[in-house]
C-alpha cells in the first residue's frame, strides 16, 4: 500500500511511496509511478531512498541526482 510522502520541504515531485523488501514504488506529482529495485538502482541507493522516504525530505532530489533513469519498470 502506498503511503503519502510527507514532503517537508514543500516542493517535492514525490507524492506517495511504497517500501518493499528489495524495492520501492514511487508516485510522482504527474501521476507517473515507477518501481526502483536493488537490481536496477543498486542496493545502497534503495536503502538511502527508503530512509529519505520515511524522513519525508530529500527523496525527489536524491532520485533526480542519482537514480532518475535507473528504474526497473514504469507502472503508469
Task: Please give the residue ranges for each predicted region.
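A charge-rich, low-complexity, intrinsically flexible signal that marks solvent-exposed coils, linkers
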Residues: 2-76
